[in-house]
Design a protein with these regions (language model features):
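Glycine-rich phosphate-binding loops of nucleotide-dependent enzymes
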Residues: 2-519
Length: 519
């Protein structure tokens, strides 16, 4: 095989038992010491291809070579033994353990063969941290560290196990602009030391900045490999989706009217005794998108959980059109015409083993339209499901296909098809485009703007700073469980201004922040 490449995947085909073809004769050639992007829409076959490279799945056909040697990667342990490591999008860390304990987990050093040698674990962590310029606190509990440090812990875990080839799955999905900049410096340092990085991302600006070459998949097929410097973001988008993509949403000036959601003086202490919300107050009005920005872990999740009915505050009030909604369950919230797009679509957004139709109709199955006497009106159910599949461009075999068999982007389209189509007065959208491709992102962003301009109130929570600045009509920033800034006009904002508030460097006066209550 060609010694230029540390990874060669040749003629890879993956067909699942249900007949779904995830990869069709895909070739992937990765050079030593390069940062190589793997791109494609959700459902294009990227994840499947990387699962095979990391030994999580087996190809139906094809060959894999690592450093010129033909290999059978029957498990992650085999892949690790060949110098391959994977940093997953959703971190696989134990929150209650320290950074050092997480890094050596599974290969924990022992004293006298019995007791955990914590000092040695700390020493290993410090040694690798220094060697690779990945600054972490070995003694900190993972539950208490910021997201950016968790990312470094995951990378160190792979490096400690001898990885020379790192697969990075959406590594910046939950990072701030500053954390992303820092991560890129660290990745370039790894590259300079001869490490090879496979970088999976939907963020075209990052691909252009950090990668040397890129391979593109579409519909499970290999569309080509390119030198990054020779292509434009527009060309990449066309190769990924087969058409031009416009991520910058055109929107009219918002004309908000009545207050629809009122949150006042929310306080919440979590099970570890940490104060996660400290006097949060805000209002959402009809016809506007109110965005919430901030580094994850600063109270956004706790706030959204309360609005979703998953938790209750220790103090404070939440009302919808004047009615208290604290303590209401999901069904009762829907009766208040609140639609919910959860951050974790797999856990809270769908029933994976149910069909597309069952998932889409689940919130309206007891409506008059969907019932005929004591029986379901199957004709109306089929028609509504098919219409939404068409409108929201859900790529599927049929309405009867299990949702769990769809790609991430198409699962998200099923969620938003249900939530956006049920005549809501308020949409709470938590990370609505996280981990989905540019085509699905474009569609969902346009829909949110379209719905807000029809008079619906939208509360948008997003870790994607560009997204939250572009879509929001007004914007709050959360830090340390508090609102530290409110911007009534987002047109003059930039990453640098936002970053200062998101990292707690700056805070507006109480009077400036109070404007978000519109009283």
């Amino acid at each position: 095989m060609n010694e230029e490449y540390v990874i060669q995947m040749k003629g890879i085909r993956k067909i699942y038992p249900n007949g779904v073809v995830a990869n069709q004769d895909v070739d992937l050639n990765v050079r030593k010491g390069e940062i190589h992007a793997l791109m494609g829409e959700n459902g294009a076959g990227k994840s499947t291809l990387m699962k095979m490279l990391f030994g999580l799945e087996q190809p139906t056909e094809g060959e894999i070579y690592v450093n010129g040697e033909k290999v059978h990667l029957s498990s992650p342990n085999v892949a690790i033994s060949k110098g391959i490591g994977m940093v997953h999008q959703h971190f696989l860390l134990v929150p209650s353990l320290t950074v050092a304990e997480n890094i050596v987990l599974g290969m924990t050093p022992k004293k006298n063969g019995i007791f955990i040698d914590r000092q040695k674990a700390i020493k290993i962590t410090e040694e690798y941290s220094k060697k690779f310029n990945l600054a972490v606190d070995p003694n900190a509990r993972v539950v208490d560290i910021p997201v950016g440090m968790k990312q470094k812990v995951e990378i160190l875990k792979a490096l400690v196990r001898g990885a020379k080839i790192l697969i990075l799955d959406e590594p910046t999905a939950v990072l701030t602009t500053q954390e992303t900049t820092e991560l890129f410096k660290e990745l370039k340092h790894l590259k300079e030391q001869g490490y090879t990085l496979i970088f999976i991302s939907h963020k075209l600006n990052e691909i252009m900045e950090i990668t040397d070459r890129l391979s593109i998949l579409r519909g499970g097929k290999f569309m080509g490999v390119y030198e990054t410097k020779d292509v434009t973001p527009e060309k990449i988008s066309r190769l990924m989706v087969g058409r031009d993509v416009v991520l910058q949403v055109q929107k009219d000036v918002a004309k908000p009217t009545d207050e629809i959601l009122r949150v006042r003086d929310l306080h919440y202490v979590n099970d570890w005794g940490k104060k996660m919300l400290n006097g949060v107050s805000l209002s959402v009005r009809k016809g506007e998108i109110l965005g919430i920005a901030g580094v994850e872990g600063n109270g956004q999740k706790e706030l959204v959980d309360m609005l979703f009915g998953l938790n209750k505050p220790n103090e404070g009030t939440i009302t919808m059109k004047g009615d208290n909604i604290i303590g209401l369950n999901q069904r009762q919230l829907r009766e208040k015409h609140i639609s919910l797009v959860p951050e974790d679509r797999m856990l809270f957004g769908i029933a994976a083993n149910a069909s597309i139709e069952e998932n889409i109709i689940s919130d309206r199955a007891d409506s008059k339209k969907m019932n005929k006497g004591l029986m379901f009106n199957m004709k109306n159910m089929h028609e509504e499901t098919d219409a939404l599949i068409k409108e929201y461009k859900v790529l599927c075999k049929s309405r009867d296909q299990k949702v769990g068999m769809l790609s991430g982007g198409n699962i998200q389209k099923v969620v938003v098809a249900r939530e956006f189509s049920n005549q809501p007065d308020l949409i709470i959208a938590d990370q609505p485009t996280r981990g989905i491709d540019v085509g699905a992102t474009e569609f969902i962003r346009k829909k949110l703007v379209e719905l807000s301009r029809s008079g619906i109130g939208v509360l948008l929570v997003s870790a994607d700073l560009n997204e939250v600045m572009e879509l929001s009509d007004s914007l709050i920033v959360m830090y340390g469980g508090q609102i530290v800034a409110y911007f009534e006009d987002t047109s003059q904002l930039n990453d640098e201004i936002m970053g200062q508030y998101m990292l707690g460097i700056k805070k507006q006066t109480a009077e400036e922040i109070a404007r978000v209550c519109h009283e």
